[in-house]
Design a protein with these regions (language model features):
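Conserved, single-site charged/polar hotspot
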Residues: 7-581
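Positively charged n-region of N-terminal signal peptides that target proteins for export
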Residues: 1-5
């Protein structure tokens, strides 16, 4: 080690040995007054913030932890986003692919330079977990759906539950284009401990068949000292809560043993390479979180191959790149509000493997569509959602997620040729029983017959176990209703020996039965010779929610000669591809 580095090491150890306390998180009181204002104050729908010359950044206001970890940064007009690679770690090893500059969080803002290929280890010490409370989230509404929000408020108040609303998301501009992904959350009014919130969730599921999520509010951010060691296992610096690493030439980093698939049967570790910069931060448990700060285009290069077959037709890959770009922008400021990053690299947000997961074909598609997104005829950024297999007919957004109808997300037959003799979803049994539907997702060379049409059988014992939390006893009846134009259901009535209840929501229905392929399905009771219930048979079509672009159908359309703007115009009701930077 050079004398200069040794001297800097000594200065860092002295300067960072006594860490400064973390700054208190910013607060904004937009809603009803509270005795204790949380880190993320709730906002009443329709109430504007008071005029002030010191209003916080809309993406970072009220968020816990180091505030600039949550900022949407820009370089040359392109957004850069902080993506979680892994968290809950005690130690992480990494190497720069080019010359590296390290910045230590804490007093003095110390820096260190290191050569390409050097190996470094970050270890968390003196970690303290965040203290947080939670409110049960009862519903989510599009920003335009004030009527739906008001109706839900009255419903819950009539049930005896005090509620409040919170405005989530943000309005921000990119190269003159306005991106607005605001929405309303309807929350239980009382801030609860995690255990009490989980108990309230169970009660709501039992009484109303409603599966809820938790809205977390940080009362005290997590903190820790991050210890940096070189390849000789020598401590060269300490950082309070955060350590930044970047390669000025943009060559990026190799990270050892990246954890992925947490909670799934494919949970494992893999050495991976990433473009962009790295941030080592403290997660909510007081452990180490590794965050990749990467430009949106480079993010898509490592993301798109996980969303679609890299061997698919180039026009389908371009369509996927455009929709994925819009989906990422739509999630900014919506997820991971209590974490030191905006998005994660798992199924919860989008699977992202960095440079390791890139493919030449999908990289070419990202580069060919650089900065392009979908805009509706009235100039709005389209919520460019997609699912794997529509089953021959896409679905309306309001059937799947509630809220007002979105003109860009209208369900329609996804047929490549006229088929006047083929029954439609209005005759669902016949539609699902028809094998010769000329659907784009059936005619695609990547067609998945067992997803296009499928059956799922459950024994009576399995159904009773799956519905036990509903409190209806032994199940005697299952009825799917409130269907959309594709036949997808958004209401399930479950009756049993101890009563009946309803499960509302396309995703909630699918989750109840261990993630059914879709809710475009019929359900029939199966009985033995004596008429006793023995099980239940679901017959269905499609894989996923069915709103927006059918990914397998997009491949079929590309193979039939359609360009990516034509494909997107079809699935998003006339939407146009336009550059945002």
């Amino acid at each position: 080690m050079s004398k200069a580095v040794l001297l800097l090491t000594a200065l860092l150890l002295v300067s960072c040995a006594t860490p400064a306390s973390s700054p208190a998180p910013a607060t904004r009181g937009l809603g009803e007054p509270e005795v204790s204002v949380p880190a993320r104050a709730a906002a009443d729908a329709g109430v504007k913030p008071p005029a002030s010359s010191g209003l916080e950044d809309p993406l970072t206001s009220g968020l816990p932890g180091p505030q600039d970890l949550k900022r949407l940064d820009f370089r040359n007009g392109e957004p850069r986003l902080p993506i979680k690679l892994m968290e809950g770690r005690d130690v992480v090893t990494f190497s720069p692919r080019g010359r590296m500059r390290l910045r230590f969080g804490g007093p003095g803002d110390k820096m260190l330079d290191a050569p390409a290929g050097s190996r470094w280890t970050v270890r968390v010490t003196q970690g303290e977990a965040a203290q947080w409370s939670a409110r049960v989230q009862l519903g989510e509404f599009r920003f335009a759906d004030k009527a739906g929000l008001a109706e839900a408020q009255e419903t819950w108040r009539a049930r005896g539950l005090a509620v409040r609303t919170h405005t989530l998301g943000s309005v921000y501009g990119i190269a003159g284009k306005v991106i607005d992904n605001r929405r309303y959350l309807l929350l239980g009014d009382e801030a609860l401990t995690p255990a009490a919130a989980a108990k309230q969730q169970a009660e709501l599921l039992h009484r109303y068949g409603l599966r809820t999520t938790l809205f977390e509010e940080v009362r005290k951010p997590a903190s820790a000292i991050l210890e940096l060691k070189d390849e000789n296992d020598t401590v060269v610096g300490l950082a309070q809560d955060r350590l930044d690493a970047e390669t000025p030439d943009g060559s990026g980093f190799d990270v050892r043993q990246v954890e992925y698939g947490v909670g799934y049967d494919f949970h494992a570790f893999e050495d991976r390479s990433f473009r962009g910069a790295l941030q080592f931060a403290v997660d909510r448990s007081g452990k180490l979180a590794v965050v990749n700060v990467v430009g949106l285009e480079d993010l898509l290069k490592g993301l798109v191959p996980s969303e679609i077959f890299a061997r698919a037709h180039p026009e389908a890959l371009k369509a996927q790149a455009v929709t994925a770009r819009g989906e990422v922008l739509a999630k900014v400021g919506i997820k991971h509000l209590a974490d030191p990053y905006l998005l994660c690299s798992e199924q919860h947000c989008a699977v992202y493997r960095g440079r390791t997961g890139e493919a030449a074909s999908t990289t070419a598609a990202v580069e060919a569509t650089r900065g392009q997104a979908l805009f509706s005829q009235d100039g709005r950024l389209v919520d460019s959602v997609y699912s794997a297999v529509c089953g021959g007919h896409t679905e309306d957004n309001d059937i799947v997620w509630g809220g007002p109808p979105d003109p860009s997300l209208r369900g329609r037959p996804d047929l490549l040729e006229s088929a006047p003799d083929v029954p439609g979803p209005s005759n669902l049994k016949a539609w699902l029983a028809t094998s010769d539907v000329p659907a784009a997702c059936k005619l695609s060379s990547f067609a998945q017959p067992t997803k296009f049409r499928w059956e799922k059988r459950f024994t009576q014992g399995q159904v009773d176990a799956l519905t036990q939390k509903l409190g209806v006893g032994a199940v005697q009846g299952l009825v799917l209703s409130e269907r959309g134009v594709s036949g997808r259901a958004r209401l399930l009535t479950v009756s049993g020996t101890q009563g009946a209840t309803q499960v509302r929501g396309e995703l909630n229905i699918r989750r109840l039965f261990g993630m059914l392929n879709s809710s475009m399905a019929t359900v029939e009771a199966e009985r033995d010779a004596e008429g006793r219930l023995t099980g239940w048979l679901f017959r269905g079509g499609g894989w996923g929610h069915g709103v927006g672009m059918c990914q397998t159908g997009a491949i079929g359309r590309a193979e039939a000669g359609q360009s990516y703007p034509e494909i997107l115009r079809f699935y998003f009701n006339g939407a146009q591809v336009a550059p945002i930077y």
